[in-house]
Amino acid sequence: MKENNSRREFLSQSGKMVTAAALFGTSVPLAHAAVSGTIHCDANNTMKITDPHYYLDNVLLETGFDYENGVAVQTRTAHQTVEIQNGKIVALRENKQHPDATLPHYDAGGKLMLPTTRDMHIHLDKTFYGGPWRSLNRPAGTTIQDMIKLEQKMLPELQPYTQERAEKLIDLLQSKGTTIARSHCNIEPVSGLKNLQNLQAVLARRQAGFECEIVAFPQHGLLLSKSEPLMREAMQAGAHYVGGLDPTSVDGAMEKSLDTMFQIALDYDKGVDIHLHETTPAGVAAINYMVETVEKTP
């Protein structure tokens, strides 16, 4: 990069590279690369790198910053070779330097390498993605209770496609450089544990290149839908976090709802992941109550 390039120019250029380059994450099986530099990185040459140990040439790496008056004004970059072994970066080398001539080498085409990204709020178990296009149907004034009733009607229609669409959504995530996620999985009487079982089956198939935590999520209200027994079954079945939802506007009993959520977490030694959408004073009260509960719990 020229020393007089503006940061905006650099970011504009590198932004075009992120999508393809992020796929070089060490845990992702798909990468845009070419054997021995014969084909350069582009979206039409997607391939799998199956070699356990290899060199990746022409990788654009951020190496530092240029400063003006003590303020970083632009990023310095350089093309280098990355040595990867068993899914981990083991060395950075001068570009196209291969100390071990027996190892295969690939050409990254000058794309910017970035750390993998994480999606920490996604619902892999229920999505329209991968199915026919549908327009948003949420009239003005729709409440969360209205959405719960609508979802209770739609879930049986979505459930046969859970695995197929979760696979496609994971493909989309990986294509944008995301290899780690936390999926909130419906646990309520309509779905039972079926969504959890379907999601676990998909994640078992994708574990080589995709890591995902599962939140057992009482989407229809922990108390409102009487989901505590199912939540406990979900924790026994391997969910990683105990989910929670608006304890006042949905469950109608802030302290009881939060106490139940925390008790499940304590009983199974798991963390909590709660979605609190309440913008009324009830939301502040819920936050304060959770802080107090955490502080007094050993």
Residues covered by each model-derived region:
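Histidine/acidic residue-rich metal-binding segments in metalloenzymes
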Residues: K194-A208, L224-P298
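Active-site gating loops and adjacent loop-to-helix segments of metal-dependent hydrolytic enzymes
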Residues: F128-T162, G238-Y241, A286-P298
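N-terminal-biased segments
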Residues: L114-P132, H184-P189, I214-L222, G271-P281, ...
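Divalent metal-dependent hydrolysis catalytic cores, especially in the metallo-beta-lactamase
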Residues: Q145, K149-P156, E164-K194, L199, ...
